[in-house]
């Protein structure tokens, strides 16, 4: 009798369920989008009840659409959008307001007030590894407690649950029997003490959040409860393998040891490096977080995010009309004058890690009379690689771990020029994933490993779509990096 794992990937835009077989292969996928609720102030919300309904619907659909016997489902794993925050009543499971999405900055004023208090920003950063920001759930939870009367009332009555999306999905799947989150998601709340591995009473007190309102933190491969998918399965199955989406992708990419890193290229880019089993504080403003806790071992990561990766190509197409589709970029880059020294710094919304210049604006440097369409497109494409190199370089300096290999996924990885240039900059091989469902697969595989269906070798089941080796001479590489750094410094100086 065959056995299957369902990997639920609850993301910003919707919910997927992946059906994974005993060999670790993806058999089928079912999807459902959910509404993006944006008000006039630009606040971004999701309906928790809609997400809960979609979780159950896609998990059932992925079984029904394949004709798999529901009795053959062995377990369920979860990957989720991080930082999005849900408040609900413990006694009824009723959401008390819409979920505050990770993108939403409605808690900015509250966080600014906290940062103005002596020692609070330092306490938060030193304890949680994260810069005090409305991006994280701590500020969102504090905002909910101050602005949603039903939440404050529930807290006073000891009935309030405040959790990240993984906690809400676990609650949904277990019919309210379990209120748990995993270590990776806990580490992104800005309330978790990374060194001690528990909720921080002093940080929670600073934000006005009662620890009693927070979920029980459970090992990422631990047992989060059981589910029959609302009566769909003939018997309850265990929920194991719960991870934030970037952490699940890191796991699926096989970055299980110190010095291994992954970059997901999308509209922006998430860059994450496994720094081993000891906490590493960043001197470059990178986020220090937990990769996961599995097999009783806690592993840490450094993380940096790039705002404009694939979005640069969208800008070239939609705003400048220099290309008709992103696939043209590779050919244009190879056709450009190799002697071109044009640099483009895409600081459309400032520069993030490791530069942290929020007021910076996009700039172009080094144009000559011979600069044409191809040279400009090449500079824009290279800017993606330079930004990711900056984050990787900061990670290597912070951690002292040499980069052994960069593992990548996402649509822009199909750009051969970009991948070669990235490999040349980081000075290491780049391994390109052959499957785009890394987050959901990471959760499913982690669940299967916990159940004894797989070993960690399952991450190699798909192999690589390609491996790119660095080939640029060292002196040329150094010259290009120096030129980029000069361009970034000039951009920051110009807009300061």
Features from the language model and the residues they span:
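Active-site core segments that coordinate phosphate-bearing ligands/cofactors
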Residues: 6-8, 108, 115-179, 190-201, ...
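Active-site donor-binding loop signature of nucleotide-sugar glycosyltransferases
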Residues: 32-34, 219, 292, 470
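Structured loop/turn residues at beta-strand edges in well-structured enzyme cores
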Residues: 68-71, 212, 401
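N-terminal glycine/serine-rich phosphate-binding loop of ATP-dependent small-molecule kinases
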Residues: 1-97, 126, 233-241, 258, ...
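Carbohydrate-associated surface elements
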Residues: 104
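Short beta-strand-loop/turn "lid" adjacent to the catalytic site in phosphate-handling enzymes
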Residues: 64-101, 128-137, 170-193, 218, ...
């Amino acid at each position: 009798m065959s056995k299957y794992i369902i990997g639920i990937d609850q993301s910003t835009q919707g919910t997927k369920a992946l059906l994974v077989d005993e060999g670790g292969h993806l058999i089928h996928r079912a999807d459902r989008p959910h509404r993006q609720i944006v008000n006039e102030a630009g606040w971004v919300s999701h309906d928790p009840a809609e997400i809960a309904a979609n979780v159950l619907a896609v998990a059932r659909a992925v079984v029904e659409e394949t004709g798999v016997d529901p009795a053959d489902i062995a377990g369920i794993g979860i990957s989720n959008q991080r930082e999005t925050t849900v408040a609900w009543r413990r006694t009824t499971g009723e959401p008390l307001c819409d979920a505050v999405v990770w993108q939403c900055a409605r808690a900015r004023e509250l966080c600014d007030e906290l940062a103005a208090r002596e020692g609070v920003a330092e306490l938060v950063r030193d304890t949680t590894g994260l810069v005090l920001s409305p991006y994280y759930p701590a500020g969102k939870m504090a905002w909910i407690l101050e602005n949603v009367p039903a939440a404050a009332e529930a807290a006073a009555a000891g009935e309030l649950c405040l959790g990240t999306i993984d906690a809400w999905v676990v609650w949904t799947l277990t019919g309210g029997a379990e209120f748990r989150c995993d270590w990776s998601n806990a580490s992104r709340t800005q309330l978790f003490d990374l060194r001690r591995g528990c909720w921080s009473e002093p940080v929670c007190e600073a934000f006005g959040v009662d620890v009693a309102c927070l979920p029980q933190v459970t090992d990422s491969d631990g047992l989060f409860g059981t589910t029959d998918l609302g009566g769909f399965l003939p018997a309850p199955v265990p929920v194991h393998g719960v991870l934030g989406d970037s952490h699940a992708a890191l796991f699926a990419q096989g970055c299980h040891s110190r010095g291994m890193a992954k970059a997901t290229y999308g509209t922006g880019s998430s860059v994450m490096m496994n720094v081993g089993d000891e906490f590493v504080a960043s001197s470059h403003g990178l986020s220090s977080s937990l990769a996961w806790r599995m097999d009783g071992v806690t592993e840490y990561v450094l993380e940096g995010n790039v705002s404009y990766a694939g979005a640069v190509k969208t800008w070239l197409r939609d705003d400048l009309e220099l290309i008709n589709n992103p696939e043209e970029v590779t050919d244009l880059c190879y056709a450009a004058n190799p002697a071109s020294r044009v640099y483009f710094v895409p600081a459309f919304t400032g520069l993030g890690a490791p530069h942290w210049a929020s007021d910076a604006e996009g700039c172009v440097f080094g144009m000559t009379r011979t600069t044409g369409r191809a040279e400009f497109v090449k500079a824009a494409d290279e800017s993606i690689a330079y930004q990711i190199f900056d984050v990787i370089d900061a990670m290597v300096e912070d951690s002292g771990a040499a980069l052994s290999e960069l593992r990548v996924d996402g649509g822009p990885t199909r750009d051969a020029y970009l991948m070669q240039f990235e490999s040349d900059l980081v000075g290491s091989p780049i391994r390109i994933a052959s499957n785009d469902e890394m987050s959901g697969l990471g959760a499913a595989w982690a669940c299967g490993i916990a159940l004894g269906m797989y070993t960690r070798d399952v991450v190699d089941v798909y192999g690589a779509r390609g491996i790119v080796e660095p080939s640029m001479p060292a002196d040329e590489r150094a010259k290009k990096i120096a030129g980029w750094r000069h361009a970034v410094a000039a951009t920051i100086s110009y807009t300061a």
